[in-house]
Structures are given as structure tokens and as C-alpha cells.
Amino acid sequence: MVNKNGRKGSQFETDVMKWLRKMGAIAERLTKAGAKDEGDMVVIISGETYILELKNRQTLTLPEFWREAQVEALNYAKARGLGEVPLSYVVVKRRNASIDQAWVIQDLAQWIKEKQ
């Protein structure tokens, strides 16, 4: 049986997936696999693959969330024999806000890589 927090997290993932699809992205939730987790969602936009780690928590621990996203993107790439690890993002639910107002977290190095 899933606890209340687990249900909230699952609902957030479903809501984000539906919103991304509405915006024209290909988005699929990924199956949980313990230490080999590959992220919460894979998203394909304009042929580019991205891994999302979604968080619906009151306490934000960004370094922990970021490490988790990086490890899981690597797991995703390894499981599929990809030569390149997809960019990953942390998507954090904002309290009392709609899905399109969720925060998207990345580091500066990744941001500049995308812009070049």
C-alpha cells in the first residue's frame, strides 16, 4: 500500500506528464528500480532526450535532489547502451501553484552547455 506522501508524489508525476504531453512533448513515467532507478520520467522534445527527477516535498534539499538526478540519468544511459548521458533536471512542485509553475533545477554548467 502506498503512503500519503507516495500518493502525492505519484500524482505530481502524473500531472507533470499530462502537462508536458499537452505541450507537445513525448513524456513517459519510468519504473522504479531501487539503486538502478533511471529517473521519474523520460521526456523527448525535438528529438532530444531528457531525464526528470520530480519532487513534491515541503523540505527542499537541492544537493540531494541534484545528485539523484545525475545518478539516475547515468543509469538510464547505461541500461540502454547510450554513448551520451541525457541532460537531467529536477522538477519541484511549488506549493499553491499550478503545474506549469513548478520549479526546474539545473546547474550552471548544464545551462551554458545547452546555450552553446
Residue ranges and their predicted role:
Residues 1-116:
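Catalytic phosphate/metal-binding cores of nucleic-acid and nucleotide-processing enzymes, i.e., regions
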